[in-house]
Amino acid sequence: SRKNFKIAEEQNDWFKSDFVDLRKGDAMDLPVEDNSIDVAAQNCLFNIFKSGDLKKAIEEMHRVLKPHGRLVMSDPTCEQEMNDELRNDERLRALCLSGSLSIADYVKALTDAGFGTIEIRARKPYRILDPKNYPTDELIYIESIEVAAIKDPMPADGPCIFTGKAAIYYGDEDYFDDGAGHTLLKNQPLAICDKTAGALQALGRDDIYFSESTFHYDGGGCC
């Protein structure tokens, strides 16, 4: 609130409350102009909204970002099916757990809104829902991921999704050029998006190694 900014101003000589433009708004109707924001951030948005509201909220963030702007996020995800009782548990909703999506569904929600590049920057253990404390017959394992969704144009062949894959060329030449914009220097890992990994693997070469997804992409990749 504005009151908190005033307190910060009193305690820090360098800070001025007018450094911050504080606006009252709604995630599904942001009081912000189109194409005006460089970076937007959210935490646990995916886990408190129902699917229709979530779709609208993501579309709103895509609307306000400038071209190539970034939506930076951290959310719980779950690769297991949750029963309806867990999904509708208000306690779990308050804990930002009941709406946990699989990573594939999470990414799809972002690309459906028009984000052309997705970077999964971290994936970590987060919580367990166990039968003793929750209405479930099995252990439910929940992870936390950190993602940047970038407002790049959507490529004709689909979004560029970086999950931490890399390709390493170890052939006889100094480098390998696939003729599609990807040059692999000999014995040097090149971070690649999942789409490019699939295209290179389809070449059937026996002198390129492909790593599995680390889900810790840190930039410098090629799509």
Q: How would you name each of these model-derived features?
A:
Residues S1-L30:
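Class I SAM-dependent methyltransferase SAM/SAH-binding core
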Residues M28-A40:
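A short acidic, Gly/Pro-enriched loop at the edge of an enzyme's catalytic core
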Residues C44, E60-H62, L110:
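Class I S-adenosylmethionine-dependent transferase superfamily signal
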Residues L45-F46, P76-E81, A122-R127:
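Short "lid" loop at the C-terminus of a central beta-strand within the Rossmann-like core
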Residues K55-R70:
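A short glycine-rich, Lys/Arg-flanked "PGG" loop and its adjoining helix->strand segment in the class I
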Residues T77-L97:
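Short, glycine-/aromatic-enriched active-site segment of Class I SAM-dependent methyltransferases
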Residues S98-I120:
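Short alpha-helix
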Residues A113-P125, L129-C223:
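C-terminal lobe and adjacent flexible extensions of AdoMet/dcAdoMet transferase-like proteins
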